[in-house]
Amino acid sequence: ITPWNWPVNQVVSKLAPCVASGCTAVLKPSEIAPLSSLVIAEIMDEAKVPAGVFNLINGMGPVVGEAMSAHPDIDMMSFTDSTRGGVAVAKASADSVKRVSQELGGKSANIILDDDAFERSISKGAHLCMNNTGQSCNAPTRMLIPSSRKSEAFQIARNTVEQVVVGDPKEESTVVGPLVSASQYQKVQSLIETGLEEGATLVTGGAGKP
């Protein structure tokens, strides 16, 4: 079961070793981004991979994902997505005692010490958070710095982020495009509001911005 934010990378990274080791595979891509998997299925067919070696099932996670996890003829589940989804997969897989491998949501720490190349590291860390329109679980979104250099770090981060081009993803200069869906956009807005309510300092951006 693969997520929407890296719809080719995640599929290939799971499928390639599976096929190479002689195992059959059943893929359920994210219902938000299924088209890449359809292309991969066509490629597998054109490559004359025997019928039944690669199987593609589209559908909603709580329906198809649960059926796959609980199915006694599936020996292992490989899941990449949210922690909530991972818990559901683990529970549904328990009765058949199948192996479960999971890569779930993260809040990656980025530790920058006083003797580091401070400006370069702050700037690079802030910019990495914008990759894939900020929709990556491995983005270093939790930056830990010496408290004595907080104001300096804020200024460097602000200067970096305010140079990021938001726009049409088809334009070469664009760094941040639209989020994957309206519901994801609203979730981000809600998280910004929650952060401010809990005492976070808004360095740049804010409500109404991705």
Question: Would you name each region that the model predicts?
Answer:
Residues 70, 76, 84-210:
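ALDH superfamily catalytic-core signature
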Residues 1-120:
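Rossmann-like NAD(P) dinucleotide-binding subdomain of oxidoreductase/dehydrogenase enzymes
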